[in-house]
Structure formats: C-alpha cells, structure tokens
Amino acid sequence: MVDLTTRVRLKAEWEKQLAIFMAFPHQNSDWTKHIHKARACFLDIIEHIVCFESVILCIDTQDDEGFEIVKKHFSKALDSTNADFMKTQDDEYIKNLFNQSVPYTLIQNPKSKYLANFGGNSAFSLHIVRVPTNDTWARDFGAISVELESPQNLAQNPSQNMAQNKAGQRDKQIQLLDFTFNGWGLKYPAFYDNAITRALFRPELTRQMDMVLEGGSIDSNGAGVLLTNTQCLLEFNRNPHLSQVEIESKLKKYFGLDSVLWLTQGYLVGDDTDSHIDTLARFISKDTIAYVKCEDEKDEHFQALRLMESELQVLKQANGEPYKLVALPFTRAIFDENGERLPASYANFLFVNGALLVPTYDDKNDEKALKILAQALPSHRVVGIDCRSLILWHGSLHCVTMQMYRL
C-alpha cells in the first residue's frame, strides 16, 4: 500500500528506460492467419530495440515453436552463457523482477543486423519468460510503471535529494501498476493477458488497481500532465460505474497528475480500441505534442482530425502558454484482404534510449514523417521500422511494446 504522503510520478516515455516489454505472437491467437509475417515483424522490431536497450519477451507456455524460433534467431554460434560474456548489472536486476517459478532464458548480446548502423559493439540482452498469453498487445495489458518518492527520505531542498541519491540513500522506487485489462471493453478474450503482471512479477513490486485502463489510452509528459480522450476512457464496457470526473480523479491520484487533457475528437477507421490516444496525438517533450493530420478533404478522417487539431490548438500549459504542435502526415488508405481499412499511423512511435522508432507502411509519406520527427527531436536517432504486418490486426509499433524503468 502506498502512503498518502508518497509522491507519485508517471514518467515520460523519453526518460531513461530499463527495457521494453513485449509478447510474441503464437498460433492460438488472432495472428494464426498471418503468423509467419507477424513473427518476422516482431523479430525485426526486437533486433532494432536491442541496439539501444534490453527486451523482456513473453512467449506463451504452449508455444514451444515460437520459443525455438526466437532462440535460433538471436543466439550466436558462441553460446550466450559463455564466460567470455559476463552478465551485466541490468541483467541481474531484470531477472530479479520475476517470480522464481517463471521459466526464464537469458540471451546476451543477441544477434542484430542493425547493430553496426548505430555504432554499437554488442547488443543489449534479450530476457525470455514463459507465461500464458492471449495476444501480443503489450502496451495495453502490460504494467504501467510509476516513480514513487517515499516521505521518510524527502528533503525540503531538491539539491539535498540529489545528494542523498548520490550517497546511495535512495528515496525513490519504481512500482508496477496492474490495471484491469478486459479486452478493450469486452471485445476480445483477455483472461491470460489480464493475469500477466501478477503471474510474471514479484508481488511486492506490483500494485493491483481498481479500474480498467489500457496503456495505449493515455500519454504522459512526465511533468504532471496526461493526454487522453473521451471516446476510449468513457466507453461503457470499461468503467461503467465511473463518471468522467471520477475517472479523472483516479488518474490524478494514481499517476500524481496536476491535469488531464481530454480530447473529444479524432479516430482512425479500423482501430478497435475506441480511439487510443497513441494512434492520434503524443507528447514528444513536456511542451510539445505530435499528432496526425489529414489534408485530403475527400478522406473520411478529414473532418474529425481537423476538429481534433482545433482542440489541441486551444490546450494550455500550466504557465498559460499553448503547446507546441508537430503535425504528422497521414498515410494513404491501406486495406486488408477483405477490403477493410487499416489504422496506419505515424503517431504510434516508440521511444527507446537515445532513439525514436517509427512505424512505416511502404507509403510515400514514410520519409516525410521520419524527417519531421527527426527535426523535432534532434537529440534522438529516428529510425523507421516496417509495420505493415502489425496493422493487419489493427495495431502498430507502440501497441506491441511497453517501456519499463529503473532508477
């Protein structure tokens, strides 16, 4: 239980991370029809991420085929447990997050064809854990990390806190908040995914929450401001007993927020999450929001996204200033084999340590989106990843990943 005087902070995604949490596609999920494409895409995403930080990968307990595919793909000829490659401090830290009963495999310095592109000599580790899973959308069922600052170590002068930390007297810790995941408002089976945090992590590291919430439905600037929308958070099958005022009160309490910014407009056809904010508008700094903009008046999204843009333009920071806005281009209309439009979005990017990974769709606007984000984030490497396989099941890069932190 958290003391009422404990300070809570929901970090921004660009802050220093420990690892990216993911879940591998398996045959007994919605991916069955496209399993080979999906697995190839996941392997490619992991190869990119391990150039910048470690990956924690859940593989279903029944998916021995997937487990062997991952091991074969990432293990080098020299066994990763060889004494020539020592365990890092982060490897031990990550392993100790898990319940001892969870089957665990460590692949150190996993193979990545991208490593040379980013000037690295060795890749970060791949931590494989075996737990039952329904699906792969880790953003929505993964634990949400918050920073706690305990009262017994709070100093009146912030510089004193820094001194305490340097002296090894930690006054902060990370807690994993385990919200209920009910398959995006009872649309899909979610029993195993809802249980993953409890099954995987040591109980003293987690806190069970009393509301339904998906990670893709919120976005934090790390400075007490949360961006979300009414379409998702007020959808009846999530928290029907809670009003908007009550939901906002809980969000402020659980994440240590000063304000919640609510959008009421914007959607993507094919998004079955009820308009997750991570496909529409995202913080890229504490005072800057990147958002998708449709300029084709004939496109069905044009009016709703123009109204969303108008809402963003009138949002105010605590100092009364408007937020800086970065418009991202819209992809051409992309359809599946049944002629259904898919929710491709450049806003579904992923921050990793020192880089921004951006989904691409073999579209004429891919390079434009990468260039815009590179100009907006000059201190980050901006890297595109082909995510056409992911949107076949209505999600993209940010949807299949969840960041974890370490102080």
Short names for language-model regions:
Residues 2-90, 94-109, 118-151, 169-407:
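The feature marks the mature, well-folded catalytic cores of soluble enzymes
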Residues 157-163:
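Long, intrinsically disordered low-complexity tandem-repeat segments
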Residues 85, 113-114, 162:
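Ser/Thr/Pro/Gly-rich low-complexity, intrinsically disordered segments
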Residues 165-167:
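Compositionally biased, flexible interaction segments
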